[in-house]
């Protein structure tokens, strides 16, 4: 049984050419990431069958949706599509919107129950309301719920938070976090926001001028020095950790990572729970030995993988091995020379701030 998704498309329209080929896991969230105009939405529409490329091939696990002699039309593809602007039926209630596609799916093909979606997205207080009375974040939650209730084998999300204000984005992100952990449906998530991608995705396809520049597990691509992600102002790495203890006196949670322990703001969760952390490159400084006295309490042993010149020529981005994972440190070239830090050296990373992703 094939559990992967494979896609390839070629299209030349006007002055834009899309020429992509990639494989992704058939589970979890794959982010289609790139700057505006890189081809993200065009690619998503080819996957949905809403547009047809001159050449294309698409296989979702064991199902072929497109090949040289086959094109499954959009209404025959078991997929859900969430757009930037939620397209809800204004004359129907929230509940009727949710059930619109669900009622058209044969019972034996229904893989998601309305009660589950209502619980995951906390829609119970809204189900009797008219959609026109909802906030932007509420409308998008309903649109996501409606897409899920079509029992899709693939969920496509085209910048679902792009039209929301900051408060609405912060409102909906926790629901997406929870949803993606509960779902057994692969998701293609289009975004040009590094924050969204790092928080939600496990896999990444990086698009640039209509081509796939790179693809793979998100942390591998976030920390690759030949890719722009490692040189962004908000460059960071995603690290896996385990809850080791809760320090109630200081309202902190202690997280076990390879070689040490990191203290973060208190997080609810049982001992042994796996979590993900986001560590910004700008929040990691380097030392040759642990400082005896410092306000930065998080200090862990790491090994220098390589040192790369940053976009800002006075700085470098240092890749550091933390066990089998990689984190980044953005420091000045002067400090690297003063400490004589070289590739392969064992040093200590002082981590000023750590953000919990989940």
UniProtKB/Swiss-Prot annotation:
The entry's keywords: ATP-binding, Cell inner membrane, Cell membrane, Membrane, Molybdenum, Nucleotide-binding, Translocase, Transport
Pfam families, A to Z: ABC_tran (PF00005), TOBE (PF03459)
Residue stretches making up the ABC transporter domain: 2-234
GO molecular function, one term: ATP hydrolysis activity
SMART domains membership: AAA (SM00382)
UniProt enzyme class: translocase
Cleavable signal peptide: none
Function field: Part of the ABC transporter complex ModABC involved in molybdenum import. Responsible for energy coupling to the transport system.
Subunit structure: The complex is composed of two ATP-binding proteins (ModC), two transmembrane proteins (ModB) and a solute-binding protein (ModA).
Protein name: Molybdenum import ATP-binding protein ModC
Organism: Hahella chejuensis (strain KCTC 2396)
